[in-house]
């Protein structure tokens, strides 16, 4: 293993085996993860699942071929309604969850139980240039990691091992995968994947890439590339909220403001608040939509 410094707190590290067609990615997010969990009072079981999904999003975004955003979601109909994590080609991330805050959730409650047994996994690619793409598959397997392995077997048809973990302090992930269109004997793949499976959840959350890769592969060390660091950053803005209000239409938005005096939109990720009063809404639509909702004659505004 080369001596590239790979102990950064919020980093994705690529590695490849020169003597066999196997590649891998390691992710450990510390400061980023701690910033995200401070945004809401997540129950322990949901916090753990969200951290795993965040690590998964950063792992999968390592395969983005173009600039854009990768969004991974887990949706259900139980106590947990949604987990969502985003990772961009600019190496920023954000994540959040929605759940029934009146429900009692045990610290060790399984993902399947949280989702009500009918969960789905949604992966969305939003390129900066081009059309978005989305894939949806049912939740199969008892964990986010197994769900992703099943998804990648279907979509890429490549042998893949994924491990995910999250604690209060950090979220971590490991992906090991056969290279496409390369011949690899089963014994070599079984050797690498078996070693990868010996990594514990505690080690994955606590250890940086250098220690993880030495712990697993010190007898057949991979070539390690320069780490890619990540930061927490929300992409919400007043302009995006304005676009959303325009999509809702003047009749609906004007009606809310006529009744309540203003309309307030909270960002689920960073909890920024965007308030639009009567003047703001009328200017946005270019006419007195609030007045119309109050029964006044329709007229434009400057």
From Swiss-Prot:
Its main location: cytoplasm. Pfam families: HSP33. Redox regulated molecular chaperone. Protects both thermally unfolding and oxidatively damaged proteins from irreversible aggregation. Plays an important role in the bacterial defense system toward oxidative stress. CDD domains: Hsp33. This is 33 kDa chaperonin. One of its GO terms (molecular function) is protein folding chaperone. It is found in: Cytoplasm. PANTHER family: 33 KDA CHAPERONIN. The keyword DNA-binding does not apply. Keywords: Chaperone, Cytoplasm, Disulfide bond, Redox-active center, Zinc. It comes from the Bacteria. The keyword Cytoplasm applies. GO terms for biological process: protein refolding. One of its GO terms (cellular component) is cytoplasm. Under oxidizing conditions two disulfide bonds are formed involving the reactive cysteines. Under reducing conditions zinc is bound to the reactive cysteines and the protein is inactive. The gene is hslO. InterPro entries: Heat_shock_Hsp33 (IPR000397), Heat_shock_Hsp33_C (IPR016154), Heat_shock_Hsp33_N (IPR016153), Hsp33_helix_hairpin_bin_dom_sf (IPR023212). Disulfide bonds join 234-236, 267-270.
């Amino acid at each position: 293993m080369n001596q590239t410094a790979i102990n950064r707190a919020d980093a994705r590290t690529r590695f490849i085996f020169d003597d066999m067609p196997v590649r891998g990615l390691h992710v450990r997010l510390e400061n980023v993860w701690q910033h995200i969990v401070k945004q809401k009072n997540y129950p322990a079981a949901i916090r753990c699942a969200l951290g795993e999904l965040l690590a998964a999003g950063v792992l999968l975004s390592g395969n983005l071929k173009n600039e854009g955003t990768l969004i991974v979601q887990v949706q259900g109909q139980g106590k947990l309604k949604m987990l969502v994590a985003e990772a961009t080609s600019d190496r920023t991330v954000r994540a959040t969850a929605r759940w029934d805050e009146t429900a009692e959730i045990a610290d060790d409650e399984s993902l399947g139980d949280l989702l009500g047994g009918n969960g789905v996994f949604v992966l969305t690619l939003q390129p900066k240039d081009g059309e978005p793409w989305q894939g949806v598959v049912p939740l199969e397997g008892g964990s986010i990691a197994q769900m992703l392995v099943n998804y990648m077997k279907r979509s890429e048809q490549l042998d893949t091992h994924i491990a995910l973990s999250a604690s209060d302090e950090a979220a971590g992930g490991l992906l090991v995968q056969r290279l496409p269109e390369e011949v690899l004997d089963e014994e070599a793949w079984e050797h690498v994947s078996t070693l990868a499976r010996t990594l514990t959840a505690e080690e994955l959350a606590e250890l940086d890439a250098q220690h993880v890769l030495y712990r697993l592969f010190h007898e057949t060390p991979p070539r390690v590339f320069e780490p890619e660091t990540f930061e927490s950053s929300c992409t919400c803005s007043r302009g995006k909220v304005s676009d959303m209000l325009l999509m809702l239409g003047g009749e609906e938005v004007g009606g809310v403001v006529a009744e309540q005096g203003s309309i307030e939109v909270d960002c689920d990720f960073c909890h920024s608040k965007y308030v639009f009063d009567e003047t703001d809404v009328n200017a946005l639509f270019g006419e007195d939509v609030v007045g119309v909702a109050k029964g006044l004659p329709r007229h434009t505004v400057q």
